[in-house]
Amino acid sequence: MAEFETIIGLEVHAQLNTESKIFSTSATKFGSPPNSQTNPVCLGLPGALPVLNEFALEKAIMAGLAFGCDITLFTKFDRKNYFYPDLPKGYQISQFDKPICTGGGVTFTIKGEDSARYVRLTRIHLEEDAGKLIHSADPNIPQSYVDLNRAGTPLIEIVSEPDMRSSDEAYYYLNSLKSVLKYIRVSDCNMEEGSLRCDANVSIRPKGSDKFGTRVEIKNLNSFKAVKAAIDYEVEWQKEMALEGKTFQQQTKLWDSVANKTVTMRTKEMSHDYRYFPDPDLPVIILQKETVESVRSKLPELPNERKNRFVEKLGLPKYDAEVLTAEREVADYFEDALKVSGDAKKTSNWVKDEILGIVNKENITISEFSVSARRIGELVKLIADGKISGKIAKTVFEELLTSDKDAETIVTEKNLIVVRDDKEIERIVDEAIANNQDAVTKYKSGKDRALGAIVGYVMKVSKGKADPELVNQMLLEKLGPLPPKS
């Protein structure tokens, strides 16, 4: 059977989180009543002239710098002409031959792999969004309604080179791209609200060939899982067509998430079909290098850089670093807690396990989490300093969730500080040995797990306050080292 290679390129539209639209002063707030955020410019009324939103331009430059793009110092806007009910002007203001950013790329790692992969970018350009069509759910009322709140919302379109060879690569590429966009705070990337949308361009070719096959563009991909599923389905469909000797036209398809298949929408338009020409209402933009460098100075530490620092400087395992740096707010929370605790690994464990566990369960952001990073840092410091055990820490944590008290106050009020009185601990250890002779016998026959039962007895009697290290030390002194198994 013939073997094929999959070729994938992605086009991502990210809505920029500006307060007003790209060429007008209308607001961009999601969820407002239909057609309540419009003005003559986004309605396309005669005589209404566009004026570029400076903040949208800056955010586009910042995105380009974050992905290592070259910034075009001489750039312009073009009219992309097509007719659709949600496009009142009859054209979309976009960028054609002079995009604001060119080149660059996205670095990502596939789960379970150590080496990073890199997908080149073709360009990033600015454009305005179209409106939204809302179709009647009643088949007896065949009507559609137009909401132009979204018309004129600023977008950047991030176009990749056809460098991806599997749906897995596409999935992790998108996750990395989204992480960077959120880190630099140019977009909230909320797919449910439509602020991040993706189209996939998919083709196949015989392995070893350097010619591209017929391309299919897939739209209506409202999640990264949908992107992965749509690519997998389309690749199999194209392989079947090739093996049967059938051909097909370049086309646009929709992803049907109910039927789990791609459905033909129309034959694909080429760039000349849109009759691009420079927008006569908008002057060309001539950027100064100083302007670009000013934007560069505002860039935060990016996810990959931060992840590498957590591993190399803080000594965290790679997995911990990946979890902590996936979102900027989580990484900030961790570092703020670490400033207080001084113990990177213990702080990491608490943030990624206990705190993110609650955050994910309650479907909130870490910014909405009730316990501040400082208070968590204080709790972890008590553990690191040996003042409380991990078990007691969880009791303290439960109270932190429902009160404004700091960890040390809770520990003091409830008398939870670890017992370090050698004589008192030795008394309990002797009692544990005397009352757990079966465990002692198993330990002396080489079963190391038996020691846990004796330690558990000590911790129960001491209500979790005995110093675990001291308990283990005393037990080894009294029982001797673990003998080889008989």
Curated annotation (Swiss-Prot):
Top-level enzyme category: ligase
PROSITE patterns on file: GATB
Keywords on record: ATP-binding, Ligase, Nucleotide-binding, Protein biosynthesis
Magnesium found in the keyword field: no
UniProt superkingdom: Bacteria
InterPro entries: Asn/Gln-tRNA_amidoTrfase_suB/E, Asn/Gln-tRNA_Trfase_suB/E_cat, Asn/Gln_amidotransferase, Asn/Gln_tRNA_amidoTrase-B-like, GatB, GatB_C_1, GatB_Yqey_C_2, Gln-tRNA_amidoTrfase_suB_CS
PANTHER family recorded: GLUTAMYL-TRNA GLN AMIDOTRANSFERASE SUBUNIT B MITOCHONDRIAL AND PROKARYOTIC PET112-RELATED, GLUTAMYL-TRNA(GLN) AMIDOTRANSFERASE SUBUNIT B, MITOCHONDRIAL
Role played: Allows the formation of correctly charged Asn-tRNA(Asn) or Gln-tRNA(Gln) through the transamidation of misacylated Asp-tRNA(Asn) or Glu-tRNA(Gln) in organisms which lack either or both of asparaginyl-tRNA or glutaminyl-tRNA synthetases. The reaction takes place in the presence of glutamine and ATP through an activated phospho-Asp-tRNA(Asn) or phospho-Glu-tRNA(Gln).
NCBIfam families: gatB, PRK05477.1-2, PRK05477.1-4
Name of the featured protein: Aspartyl/glutamyl-tRNA(Asn/Gln) amidotransferase subunit B
Origin species: Leptospira interrogans serogroup Icterohaemorrhagiae serovar copenhageni (strain Fiocruz L1-130)
